[in-house]
């Protein structure tokens, strides 16, 4: 089994502001993650090596597609290119999701308060759409 990232098709892109956008892509059948985890996402680099950065998965673990939020950084090595993707383009998806903002790490209780700004909302979006949270 290769550790190389898989190529996934971009299904949709939505630009919310001049600094924030979201995109969805296909999800390999074998890709498993826990709601709240992050994964390496990227594009091919100019030197032939993948240019990857960590992105929290915003979709719940039961969804057939993967959803991500990103900020736009004009001179960012990855985001300067990623912000220009459109439906039909390809992105690279790492093989191993990781993270500690998962249901197993949350203490049981009546209320769960989540605070974030910008793209920090992504793992919360995953968790609040997971029926196991309730």
Language-model features and meaning:
Residues 2-89:
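Ferredoxin-reductase
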Residues 77-134:
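FNR/FR-type flavoprotein reductase catalytic core
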């Amino acid at each position: 089994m290769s550790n190389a990232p898989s190529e996934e098709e971009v299904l949709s892109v939505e630009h919310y502001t001049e600094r924030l956008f979201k995109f969805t892509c296909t999800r390999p059948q074998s890709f498993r993650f826990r709601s709240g985890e992050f994964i390496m996402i990227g594009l091919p680099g100019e030197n032939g090596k993948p240019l990857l950065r960590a992105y929290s998965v915003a979709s719940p673990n039961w969804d057939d597609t993967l959803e991500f939020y990103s900020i736009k950084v004009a001179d960012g090595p990855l985001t300067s290119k990623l912000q220009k993707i459109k439906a039909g383009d390809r992105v690279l998806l790492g093989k191993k999701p990781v993270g500690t903002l998962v249901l197993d790490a949350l203490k049981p209780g009546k209320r769960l308060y989540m605070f974030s700004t910008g793209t920090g909302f992504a793992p919360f979006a995953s968790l609040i759409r997971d029926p196991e949270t309730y």
